[in-house]
A protein has these predicted regions:
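N-terminal hydrophobic targeting/anchoring segments and the immediately downstream early-domain regions
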Residues: 1-208
Length: 208
């Protein structure tokens, strides 16, 4: 299938032992599974698709139907009245720092960052049930913890997908870790340690 290129050569750096100091840079705040939040219809595109970039890097249906105009959430967040609804392969208007409703963490782009030295990635599972209830389009539950658990499952599916691209279980660069020792091992193996976090106003269903 057609795929985004990374245009990077050479092997990623690693440690000489599993226990030494680690080197690399950190992305400490990302919402990599945001395609499932706010009911699952507010974010356009996703980090991967079994059929590659042409299916993962697409605009939301409501944006496409109006030619990129009338996308209220995108317009409010970006300050732009409209945008080119075509993602792959032209990417005229997105991804972009001001375009918060469009995918920016496609797996090949993350691979480029990893090959360029990123070694720690903090992925925050995110939800806001009140905004979800207000947004008119949805396919998922607005309950914070339902959404958080769904995004956590998607993180593991994402890891499995990257593993498959690199030859099998455990071979991919994206490795979910649960403690500092695991993170050190992963980074010194030349891979990227991924920390799962939560950003929600209603953790564990306390007030919803």
């Amino acid at each position: 299938y057609p795929e985004s290129q990374i245009d990077v050569v050479g092997g990623p750096h690693a440690g000489v032992s599993a226990f030494q100091e680690v080197r690399g840079y950190v992305d400490a705040h990302t919402h990599g599974m945001a395609f499932e939040f706010l009911g699952g219809e507010a974010h356009c595109g996703k980090p991967w698709d079994r059929y590659g970039a042409p299916y993962a890097l697409v605009d939301c249906e409501d944006h496409t139907l109006t030619g990129g105009y009338g996308a209220a959430l995108e317009t409010f967040l970006s300050g732009e009245p409209g945008h080119d609804p075509v993602g792959w392969p032209t990417f005229k208007d997105w991804p972009a720092p001001h375009s918060l409703t469009h995918e920016g963490t496609y797996y090949r782009w993350m691979e480029r960052a990893w090959r360029g030295g990123q070694r720690l990635f903090v992925n925050l599972l995110v939800e806001n049930n009140k905004l979800c209830e207000i947004y008119p389009l949805k396919r998922n539950s607005c309950d914070d913890m339902d959404s958080i658990r769904l995004q956590a499952r998607q993180m593991h599916k994402f890891q499995d997908y990257i593993d498959a691209q690199f030859g099998g279980p455990g071979k991919g660069f994206y490795r979910i870790v649960t403690n500092p020792f695991q993170a050190r091992q992963v980074i010194n193996a030349g891979k990227m340690a991924v920390i799962m976090g939560i950003e929600t106003s209603v953790p564990f269903g306390c007030t919803f």
